[in-house]
């Protein structure tokens, strides 16, 4: 417990840097300095991984070393702030006058960013419900199913989510720029291309993960054969429709960019809460643990269909402008 507390406190010290780092990289995307952002993130990842290996295997720092690792992996991004201070490297220069709070701007930031905040809360609800159902429906094997969900949600689905984020984070600044410039044809083309390439890419990733489910789960789950078997079997079910499910995240990011907060909030909650939670309860009580896994597939499919419908409606709207 003391080791864990030390790790949490260490990360808390570095938390301000991680917040600044996330903000800076987001602004870099808007400023179209994607290569600089990518270089900064790559360097931070290399440094953080090297530190994790050193602190774990050589220095034996335990959880405290992991706290520093998490802080470094994102906190180093904060160095990017110097891109916006002094000189003419960017049009978005920060001056002392900008440090004064403008509550009107703060309100606008809160309004546009609120959907993303709700998505984070939605994932908490989603994880809580899934763990609770797997534990209760799994009986004596409940802890094994919870561990399997941890592997799937923490690693397998995280991999697919990172792929989806590449598209959604790339779409957002371009969509915001084109919307501001009233370049509706470019905005429509950008949205269409992003969704098409995202579905195709995630479909290929899904096939790869489905075929390699056992070795991938073994890599993350360790040497427990029972856990690997349960996680691999569940993975082959859960990932079947993620190529559709993550369309909601991209559409939410798009609607945030064009300042349609209501629809952005709806699509942000669609996969994790609106579809997944009721279906997990319904199919879980009907089919047991297998019903929970199947519920995630059905939720992804429904989420994808709704997202495609919203994208089609938005494309028609843009065509009339």
Model-derived features: where do they sit?
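Short alpha-helical transmembrane segments in multi-pass integral membrane proteins
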Residues: 1-14, 54-114, 175-241, 282-321
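Short runs within selected transmembrane alpha-helices of multi-pass transporters and secretion channels
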Residues: 10-30, 37-48, 66-82, 168, ...
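Transmembrane helix-bundle signature of multi-pass secondary active exporters and lipid flippases
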Residues: 14-18, 111-177, 198-205, 235-249, ...
């Amino acid at each position: 417990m003391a080791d864990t507390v030390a790790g949490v406190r260490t990360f808390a010290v570095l938390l301000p840097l991680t917040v600044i780092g996330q903000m800076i990289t987001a602004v870099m995307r808007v400023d179209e300095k994607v290569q600089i952002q990518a270089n900064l993130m790559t360097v931070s990842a290399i440094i953080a991984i090297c530190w994790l290996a050193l602190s774990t295997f050589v220095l034996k720092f335990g959880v405290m070393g992991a706290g520093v690792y998490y802080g470094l992996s994102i906190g180093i991004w904060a160095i990017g702030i110097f891109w916006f201070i002094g000189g003419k490297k960017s049009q978005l220069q920060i001056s002392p006058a900008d440090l004064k709070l403008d509550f009107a701007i703060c309100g606008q930031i809160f309004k546009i960013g609120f959907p993303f905040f709700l998505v984070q809360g939605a994932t908490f609800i989603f994880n809580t419900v899934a763990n609770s159902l797997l534990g209760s429906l799994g009986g004596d094997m409940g802890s094994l199913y919870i561990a399997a969900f941890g592997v799937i949600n923490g690693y397998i689905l995280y991999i697919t989510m990172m792929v989806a984020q590449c598209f959604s984070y790339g779409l957002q600044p371009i969509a915001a720029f084109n919307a501001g410039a009233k370049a509706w044809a470019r905005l429509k083309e950008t949205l269409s291309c992003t969704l098409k390439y995202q579905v195709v890419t995630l479909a290929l990733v899904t096939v790869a993960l489905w075929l390699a489910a056992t070795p991938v789960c073994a890599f993350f789950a360790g040497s427990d054969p029972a856990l690997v078997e349960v996680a691999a079997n569940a993975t082959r079910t859960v990932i079947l429709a993620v190529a559709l499910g993550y369309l909601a995240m991209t559409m939410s990011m798009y609607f945030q960019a064009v300042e349609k907060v209501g629809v952005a909030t709806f699509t942000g909650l669609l996969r994790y809460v609106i579809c997944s939670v009721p279906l997990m309860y319904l199919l879980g009580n009907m089919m047991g643990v297998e019903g929970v896994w199947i519920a995630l597939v059905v939720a992804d499919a429904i989420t994808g269909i709704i997202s495609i419908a919203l994208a089609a409606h938005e494309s028609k709207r843009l065509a009339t402008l």
